């Protein structure tokens, strides 16, 4: 399988080398890296070229690397039923650097791009309706970013007296603690079967 993927990578580099910044075969899948300005041209080639035939769009997802200057990877997964192969295309982008929407190439990417915007704050230029799709109206922040607090910022509940949904600041019932369960000094005390017999001797 990896031999066929290496041949495909060589073919793509020969045909459209200027559009591909890097390629690697890992875990039985070919990954191409490209720049945002080359994305539409590369995906159009992968879809329309007879040797490639990646006509099935599977997914768009975001990956957050807060320590990098280009914080996000936008990752596209495609399938070629003709060749029975999958391919992954990655584009790195910063917090305020938009990526072109691929809805002109794969119309099914519409809601996936909206989800990446809603969860990570990744901007897509040329998207027909880029607005939140999973979070509530007026939601602040992007919940899948690694710097988003686990508790969130607001608590949503139904108020029986007001007969409506209310938003309140998060109120923790106890102080937030970070346990290191692997540490013999901080972990919880475990009572194992038979421990009580050993203490009575």
From Swiss-Prot:
Transmembrane segments: none annotated. It catalyses: a quinone + NADH + 5 H(+)(in) = a quinol + NAD(+) + 4 H(+)(out). It is a peripheral membrane protein. NCBIfam families: NuoC_fam, PRK06074.1-1, PRK06074.1-5. Its main location: membrane. The keyword Membrane applies. NDH-1 is composed of 14 different subunits. Subunits NuoB, C, D, E, F, and G constitute the peripheral sector of the complex. This is NADH-quinone oxidoreductase subunit C. Keywords: Cell inner membrane, Cell membrane, Membrane, NAD, Quinone, Translocase, Transport, Ubiquinone. One of its GO terms (molecular function) is NADH dehydrogenase (ubiquinone) activity. The gene is nuoC. InterPro entries: NADH_DH_suC (IPR010218), NADH_quin_OxRdtase_su_C/D-like (IPR037232), NADH_UbQ_OxRdtase_30kDa_su (IPR001268), NADH_UbQ_OxRdtase_CS (IPR020396). One of its GO terms (cellular component) is plasma membrane. Its EC number is 7.1.1.-. Belongs to the complex I 30 kDa subunit family. It comes from the Bacteria. Pfam families: Complex1_30kDa (PF00329). It is found in: Cell inner membrane.
């Amino acid at each position: 399988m990896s031999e066929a993927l290496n041949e495909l990578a060589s073919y793509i580099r020969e045909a459209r080398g200027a559009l591909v910044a890097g390629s690697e075969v890992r875990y039985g899948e070919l990954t191409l890296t490209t720049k945002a300005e080359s994305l539409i041209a590369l995906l159009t080639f992968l879809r329309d070229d007879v040797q490639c035939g990646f006509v099935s769009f599977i997914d768009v997802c975001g990956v957050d690397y807060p320590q990098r200057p280009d914080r996000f990877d936008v990752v596209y997964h495609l399938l070629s039923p003709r060749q029975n192969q999958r391919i992954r295309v990655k584009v790195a982008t910063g917090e305020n650097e938009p990526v072109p929407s691929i809805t002109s190439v794969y119309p099914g990417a519409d809601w996936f791009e909206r989800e990446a915007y809603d969860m990570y704050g990744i901007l897509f230029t040329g998207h027909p309706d880029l607005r939140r799709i999973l979070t509530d109206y007026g939601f602040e922040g992007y919940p899948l970013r690694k710097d988003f607090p686990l508790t969130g910022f607001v608590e949503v509940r139904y108020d029986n007296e007001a007969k409506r949904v209310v938003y309140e600041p998060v109120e923790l019932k106890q102080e937030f603690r970070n346990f290191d369960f692997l540490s013999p000094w901080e972990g919880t005390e475990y009572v194992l079967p038979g421990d009580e017999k050993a203490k009575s001797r």
